[in-house]
Amino acid sequence: MREIISLNEGWTLRFPKGERAAETVTLPHTWNAVDGMDGNGSYLRTTGVYSRTFKKPVQPLAGGRVYVEVLAAALDATVKVNGTVATTHEGGFSIFRADITDLCRDGDNELTIEVSNEDTPSMYPASADFTFYGGLYRGVNLISVPNAHFDLDYYGGPGIMVTPKPTADGGATFEIKSFVTNPDDSFTVMYSIEDPYGCEVASAVRPSDNTAISIYVPDAELWSMDEPNLYTVVARLQRNNEAFDEIYANVGVRSYTVTPDGGFAINGEATPLRGVSRHQDKLYKGNALTVEDHYQDAQIIKELGANTIRLAHYQHSQDFYDACDELGFAVWAEIPFISVFKSGKDAHTHVMEEMKELIIQNYNHPSILFWGISNEILIGGISQELVDTHHDLQKLCKELDPTRLTTIAHVSHTPTSGPMHRITDVESYNHYFGWYGGKIEQNGPWLDKFHAENPDICLGISEYGCEGIINWHSNTPQCKDYSEEYQALYHEYMAQAFEDRPWIWASHVWNMFDFGCAARSEGGVKGRNNKGLVTIDRKTRKDSFYVYQAYWAKDPMVHIAGRRHAQRAGETTEVKVYSNQDTVTLYCNGKEVGTQTAHRVFKFDVALDEGFNVLMAVADTVKDSITLEKVETEPACYTLPEFNERQEGVANWFKQMGSMDLTAPMEFPEGYYSIKDSLEELAKNEEAFAVTAKAVKLATNFDIKPGEGMWAMMKKMTPEVMAGMISIMPDGFIESLNAKLIKIKK
């Protein structure tokens, strides 16, 4: 029988280039757990060599095969047994295995896995707005099987494919195919289907060289986000009265559709998908997460009331997909074809292989409804080769899995018509109106305009959000002040905008959790993206978390916002309450302030007493309370210092323009720099780049430096494109930048 042996203990990690001393580690492990998010501006991208010994497992009968299974190695790996290469693998997010039987010897065997998170010419991701952690961050197993066994070689797959389909009479057919290695005429495959309660409801037997079958189950219980009923399909490789190998798959019976006007429906019921995106890292663990970490994340998302998760921007752990199956989430699973397109045959082969691994390894998960083929890939521009690659990926998805829909996440400046549309079954945009530029109120009109111009496209929003840092607070929140209040205000608008538009097939907040991004330095916090609804340590649910809980959660809830804005000045202060109940009553120090009937967001003007005040909100059977202190002057530490500095810098920038008419048509004289030049081109001239870098910093709070941070992702962009992405510059700003650049000769 199959035996799976964990090899997570007792590894030695050394660095051949000598960046760090050798150490003993336990898997899951990453060498970037700290420097990948500590804000020092860079992190170790190198090769690490993991090594340990093992004893060859022995099957009861003669023979048998031994495999090493690597659950993920970031970003590429070479596996050796006793000094001989067993396999190599490019791609940091998928399972891969190697048959090492013939490399093993009696007694101790040495297993070494060389792992690198350095960039390579053909591998994705090339550059992106998150840390590329290095290491064996999911674990390693030995798998011992008889000579005849269910397949372990094909793209890291599970050896079985199950396609449940509901039937008109309330039953379901389970189309099953398993893959047997080294079968002979004496073997059969026995299938058993167990219902969500563990009772066998159907079975069948097939010859081992022709395993495909369709099994009917009456009165099938459907899988949905509200009722995630799971069936278990067990496959046993049988000879006489002995089971030689056994595998299983947890699956769900469901059907779903997406239409441009009706949005998403599951099992015939209209159900707008409203949820979040998620990265796989945690404070000072990096991406080396345990099973408990994955399930904790899924439980917090369930607490939010979300029914969908976009798993960005790569294949996630089987543990998390399992959690989504069990808890009921509609999952968007994608490959790291992101930001920067790499030209050439090798890069094309690599991205196709990543899609094959994603689909083959995850085909049985009922939670996965959408395969995502790329994210913001036009950041570096468009080419026919890029478009053709998308068509190739779409074709591949349909060949491997005709049962699911495909999707894409367009960068904001992707034209609303053109060759990138109508490739995938459904589409989404990443938009940040109200954060990187523009106004929150632009979001709704943009959605309506796109829908009117493209009535045949199923439209979703795959990313939207803004940073919220729980140190910063404001009574008058503004874009780019990084306050918890502005983040909540932003999401109040967005939650309502999507509720008003059920035809938006899915919306995904960017992001559920703050996450590591070593290149970032924003809002006084370095090394992280702080757009999460929950902090990176999972300790604090920001006020914006409760905005969505009020809109999405089914259980009664009430939450008083602003509890970290604990010291308030003024005769009165605004107190916001979020609730999914119709009516909220607020009390201050036991006295009723008022009762309001509203939709999700309740606002009260409260006259605080001197000193400390206890506020309590009551909504039907639920209540919440906070304590506020009335003070003469609110602490200066509530305001991000650089917010005022940047506002002053923008004002000074315009003063330098004098009386120039910034409404006049822009000019682009030949032989001079302009906003049409890429950052890479502008960097060739010290003066031109200094002007551009200052403009970008003032308008977006991004520091751009050649060779540092997100330079690889941004270098092909022009200031003109950046401005067009999301109205990124203040009015007149791009014109003033161009006016300065056209004075600088190339």
Which role does the model predict for each range below?
Residues D102-D108, K177-T259, G611-F612:
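Extended acidic/polar, glycine-enriched regions
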Residues L662-I734, N738, K745:
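Compact, charge-rich alpha-helical regulatory domains located at protein termini
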Residues L7-E9, F15, T26-N40, I100-A172, ...:
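An acidic-aromatic loop/edge-strand motif
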Residues E3-K17, N40-G41, R45-D153, P183, ...:
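Accessory beta-strand-rich segments of carbohydrate-active enzymes
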Residues L27-D38, T84, E118, M123, ...:
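Extended substrate-binding grooves/exosites of carbohydrate-active enzymes
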Residues V145-H149, D153-D169, F264-Y284, L640-Y672, ...:
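Compositionally biased low-complexity segments at domain edges in trafficked proteins
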Residues G64-V66, G170-I176, E571-V575:
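Structural beta-strand segments of beta-rich domains
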Residues T46-V58, Y154-G170, Q549-T573, E642-F643, ...:
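Extracellular ectodomain segments of secreted/surface proteins
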